[in-house]
């Protein structure tokens, strides 16, 4: 399949009525100035979200975006950040929000590495991951007894390790399909789909800057 063809699909549901109400409030609230702190995971923030950040900056020049790379919702629940953008199917019940799109994942390896192990009749090595609970769980399910000779706690680091022939690992398809050095070792399985959630604290649901981001992402 073409690069990125299966990686992100529109969500099948929407909160159109709620969003319409929020948009009305947004038009009445002129306080679209100040700082907006967004916590987002590294691989999403530096790739697919960057275009959205750039267009938001142009649409709302008086709002200063502060993007923090983080995989934890703790900073949001403690009010250190205004919005968190997460890949998950089970967002914490302390926060509210909605899933915007579905992100597929597959197992990837370097093209030359996979060719080499196939010629030798060997099984590819698995890269140990500790970047998030779902990637860690999926890896364990596929190679529970496997000894990992390389371990990573960051998806971008895992991507680099795959490129260097250190083994195979799960990656979001928007990352793996876009890299010509990589090849799918397996096709995406729907059970590994994750939602891209925009989360915020309940007290901030009517804040003008938060509403502006929600409306902008929903376009």
Residues covered by each model-derived region:
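Short, well-ordered beta-strand segments
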Residues: 37-39, 84, 127, 169, ...
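A late-sequence structural motif
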Residues: 188-219
């Amino acid at each position: 399949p073409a690069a990125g063809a299966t990686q992100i699909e529109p969500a099948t549901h929407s909160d159109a009525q709620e969003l319409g109400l929020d948009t009305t409030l947004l038009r009445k609230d002129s306080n679209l100035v100040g700082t907006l702190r967004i916590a987002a995971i590294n691989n999403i923030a530096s790739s697919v979200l960057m275009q959205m950040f750039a267009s938001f900056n142009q649409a709302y020049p008086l709002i200063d975006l502060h993007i923090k790379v983080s995989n934890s919702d703790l900073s949001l629940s403690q009010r250190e950040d205004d919005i968190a953008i997460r890949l998950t199917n089970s967002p914490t019940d302390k926060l509210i929000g909605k899933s915007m799109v579905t992100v597929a994942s597959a197992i990837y390896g370097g093209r030359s590495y996979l060719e080499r192990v196939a010629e030798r009749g060997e099984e590819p090595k698995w890269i140990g991951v500790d970047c998030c609970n779902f990637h860690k769980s999926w890896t364990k399910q596929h190679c529970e007894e496997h000894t990992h000779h390389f371990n990573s706690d960051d998806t971008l680091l895992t991507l680099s390790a795959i490129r260097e022939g250190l083994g195979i690992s799960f990656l979001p398809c928007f990352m793996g399909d876009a890299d010509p050095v990589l090849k799918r070792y397996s096709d995406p399985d729907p059970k590994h789909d994750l939602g891209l959630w925009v989360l915020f604290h309940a007290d901030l649901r009517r804040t003008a800057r938060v509403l502006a981001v929600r409306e902008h992402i929903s376009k």
